[in-house]
């Protein structure tokens, strides 16, 4: 499994690492990959795409790296299972609802309720680990 993420402050990266911990605890292999380092062809061979991005600005996906990545894969992911996660500093999670809606629009199957965490995942560490375990057992 591969977890692809973008993180501005490190919070979403921490979430990715905790989700990976849950996957590993379930007996599966996983790699966490910053979106700037992802090999899209390899990623598309995965059964489940695990994608994470923090909210930016007016609750949107990060525009210089993550948004172009999503645009690039958008025509290649119909029928794929996806799991979404990310952190935010303010707002109510609109960016994640929009992200989930887009993935559904591309023909993806969102396999778990997207996981969002306000600020650092300290208090939500176990939630992140459990999210990883759920994904590993799909």
Swiss-Prot record:
Question: Which Gene Ontology MF annotations are present?
Answer: electron transfer activity; FMN binding; oxidoreductase activity, acting on NAD(P)H
* Keyword Transport (UniProt): yes
Q: Which cofactor does it need?
A: FMN
Q: Which Pfam families does the record match to this protein?
A: Flavodoxin_1 (PF00258)
The record's listing under InterPro entries reads: Flav_short, Flavodoxin/NO_synth, Flavodoxin_CS, Flavoprotein-like_sf
- Keyword entries, A-Z: Electron transport, Flavoprotein, FMN, Transport
NCBIfam families per the record?
flav_short
Name of protein = Flavodoxin
Organism classification: Bacteria, Bacillati, Bacillota, Clostridia, Eubacteriales
């Amino acid at each position: 499994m591969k977890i692809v993420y973008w993180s501005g402050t490190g919070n979403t990266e921490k979430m990715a690492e905790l989700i990976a911990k849950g996957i590993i605890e379930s007996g599966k292999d996983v790699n966490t990959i910053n979106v700037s380092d992802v090999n899209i062809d390899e990623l598309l061979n995965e059964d489940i795409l695990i994608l994470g991005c923090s909210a930016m600005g007016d609750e949107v996906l990060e525009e210089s790296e993550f948004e172009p990545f999503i645009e690039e894969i958008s025509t290649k992911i119909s029928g794929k299972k996806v799991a979404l996660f990310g952190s935010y500093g303010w707002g109510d999670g609109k960016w994640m609802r929009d992200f989930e809606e887009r993935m559904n629009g591309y023909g993806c199957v969102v396999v778990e309720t997207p996981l969002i965490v306000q600020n650092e995942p300290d208090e939500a560490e176990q939630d992140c680990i459990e999210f990883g375990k759920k994904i590993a057992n799909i």
